[in-house]
Amino acid sequence: MLITVLDVGGTHVRWARWSPEQGLGDVRRTSSPSTFRQPGVSVDESRAVLVRMMAEVVPAGAVAGVSFGAALDHRTRAVYASAPLWGVDSRPFDLVAALRGARPDVRWHVVNDVTAALLHLASTQRARGLRKVWLATISTGVACRVIDQRTGEIPVDGCGLQGEIGHLPATVAVDGLPLDLRCDCGRQGHVAAYASGPGIRRLGEVLRHRRGPVWVASDLAQELARGEPFEVALTRAVRSGDTVAVELLAAAAKPIADIVRTSLCLDPELDLVAFTGGVALGLGEHYLAAVLAHLDRDGLYLTSERKPDWIRDRMAVTEVSGLVGAGIAALSEELT
């Protein structure tokens, strides 16, 4: 079965054709319509543009699998909110109904983007034979999912949600002074306010003001002055050992390390703890090292002292495809 797969994120909409036999075809992409890109456009208008965009790329009579970057109810597929796409607006949106209304000839299947990425990771050789797999995406937003490989289950709560860690409260300090940064959802002090791509840029502004001439002389500031995008500048500066960039990454990694610590403390069956998304992949092993540095300093009671490799050996930065995961989810639903 050939499936049209789409991945809707806060930055891009991507689409391709996929099948288990042929794999993923050529991927095309365009900019995501959002209230951040078009501040004068209402959320309803932005949603309508997005639905039209998605509907136009699917062939007649096709099956479509969608990886969607939003908190959504995995029982009903109702979309609750997407801070990167629609900011503070949290009115439920029946995306599946809107897509079916635009293209009733298509069989639509929608899952959350982190769920899709996790389904792809769970299908790989690396994840086979494991008990549970934990995956967090660190990108325009931050979220996490856990799958029990023995049953294939991704449990959800009373709202059909799991792992919306980006909107948990977090504590981050610079020079010993706690910061209270604003998340894209409108609330203060969330994990994503510090650890997402936009959050790291906000932290960068704090350091720019706090460090003054040290910031100006830093590799990070020099890269930015040459017109490099922030993510590229940060990655280059971290790789060069720039102290300001390393400090910035350490601050951004702390809320994620806090969540990993708690996750492993409560569930030792997590055999793989993985990170993906633009931020984590761009920084690669440097991102993992920043998280592990926090866990080395403040780890699991007794375990970190007596079995220090127990945490390190199960952690990785890995590239997975929400497009492939959307295809896997759609195929599974088609066959049931």
Pin down the residues of each PLM region.
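Glycine/GP-enriched mid-protein hinge/lid loop-to-helix segment characteristic of carbohydrate kinases
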Residues: 2, 18, 26-28, 36-40, ...
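Conserved phosphate-binding loops in N-terminal lobes of ATP-dependent enzymes
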Residues: 2-78
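Conserved glycine-rich phosphate/nucleotide-binding loop
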Residues: 9, 297-336
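Conserved A3 ("GATE") glycine/threonine-rich loop of ANL adenylate-forming enzymes
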Residues: 11-12, 116, 139-143
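Glycine-rich phosphate-binding loops at beta-strand->alpha-helix junctions
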Residues: 12, 263-298
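Glycine-rich phosphate-binding loop and adjoining helix at the ATP-binding site
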Residues: 35-47, 63-64, 71-134, 164, ...
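Adenine-nucleotide phosphate-binding core of ATP-dependent small-molecule kinases
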Residues: 39-59, 187, 191-193, 199-202, ...
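Glycine-rich beta-strand-to-loop/alpha-helix junction loops that act as flexible
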Residues: 64-70, 138-140, 272-281
